[in-house]
Amino acid sequence: DEKSFIVGTDSLRVIIRDCPLRMTWQRRADDWVTVSEDRPTGAYEIGTHTGQVAHHRVRNIDDRYYGLGEKSGDLERTGRIFDMRCLDALGYDAGSTDPLYKHVPFLMTRTANGAFGIFYDNLSASRFNLGAEVDNYHRPFTSWQADHGDIDYWVMTADHLCDLTPQILRLTGDPAFLPRWALGYSGSTMHYTDAPDASHQLLKFIDLLREHAIPCDSFQLSSGYTTMGSRRYVFTWD
């Protein structure tokens, strides 16, 4: 027979069930309301040979998903699959390219019962399926899958999505407060160094800054400013 037990506080609790293992997260409103529920059919997967791991949760029709760091397309992520890797995606399409330069495995969900956040503490390459996949043998679901490591996650709840931000910052730490001198504009490009009249292009850039009254604290030639054939390099060994 299925067994269950409850662990929680005055504002948040988790109901843990076995056969198979799954969890239901609830927050206190006027009564206890569910904000996240593991898929009842195989919520957790651990590949004994591949090392891959996965976590599947129930997707309700009115759930809306946000977060994941720098991603293309709308801020509302529902219905897409996102690859959590870092690439130099030069020339990417702002509406569809994935992955991009940086990501954060923190997913926020707006539910009918409040906001729910889940942060996966795993450094390997991973993927989020936010409703793009449909499987006849399971209820509608979302998934997180990682190539290696543990299924190790943190959860948080709030009345509104914006209230989740202070909570994740308490966990990961605040961004460093920049000094005033670091807030200026720094120009950067690879285009000028490719031009046959590179020196003229650089001086023209300075003239344009003056024309439009744009202050500029520094300028760099960016990555790839040396070349060998068709390839770019940060520097070239002699």
Summary of predicted features, one role per range:
Residues L183-T193, S222-T227, R231:
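Aromatic-lined carbohydrate-binding surfaces of glycoside hydrolases
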